[in-house]
Amino acid sequence: MEPKIKIRGVNFFYHRHQVLKNINMDFPDRQITAIIGPSGCGKSTLLRALNRMNDLVSGARLEGEVLLDNENVYSPNLDVVNLRKRVGMVFQQPNPFPKSIFDNVAFGPRMLGITAQSRLNEIVEKSLHQAALWDEVKDNLHKSGMALSGGQQQRLCIARVLAVEPEVILMDEPCSALDPVSTMRIEELMQELKQNYTIAIVTHNMQQAARASDWTGFLLTGDLIEYGRTGEIFSRPKDKRTEDYITGRFG
């Protein structure tokens, strides 16, 4: 099967500081790919390169290609707004807007020009169902998203991404601010979502990567040390540095 996203020969710089070094990596369609490695190794930079979130940072520069369905997302004429619709992002800290639960989810569709209330109602309900939040909030859609628990807020943010019908979901440490029960719910949700979406997740949590992902890439000081099936990476790593990291010898 053709990968949904292919990274080919990517070097990434902030001004003169090189953060990623000749990265070649695939993100298979409708699979979960984890990016692991110690702090400062370039994980989040790699993830954000997939939908050009790094463009917002002064001095950021990418060499190489990031191919989404074989189209280079760094082509000069590419519509970046449409790219970020196709490749959505869930951040480390839940970041609901200071609006109602309904308006949080409806925000993206409204920005895309959808105004019919009946259609917005459908999108909000479907997205909250997909994010496994509907049953908990269906009678309180008028209440502020800020009033939800941390785990509920993160699922609301996932619903907000789903509402614009992306093809890829990027998750940057989505459970680091959550308790174990909420973390388990997000991991279960990821397994449901991969039936329809390609997912890439950055995580510090080795157990989470082993449990939740199909593929894993290990980054160290900007180099992709090893990439492969998660079961292989965690049970039979080919590189001593990978073994040292996943067994806790450093990181």
Swiss-Prot record:
Keyword Nucleotide-binding: yes
EC number: 7.3.2.1
CDD domains reported in the protein's UniProt record: ABC_PstB_phosphate_transporter
GO molecular function, one term: ATPase-coupled phosphate ion transmembrane transporter activity
Gene that produces this protein: pstB
Matching InterPro entries: AAA+_ATPase, ABC_transporter-like_ATP-bd, ABC_transporter-like_CS, P-loop_NTPase, PstB-like
Function: Part of the ABC transporter complex PstSACB involved in phosphate import. Responsible for energy coupling to the transport system.
Name the record gives this protein: Phosphate import ATP-binding protein PstB
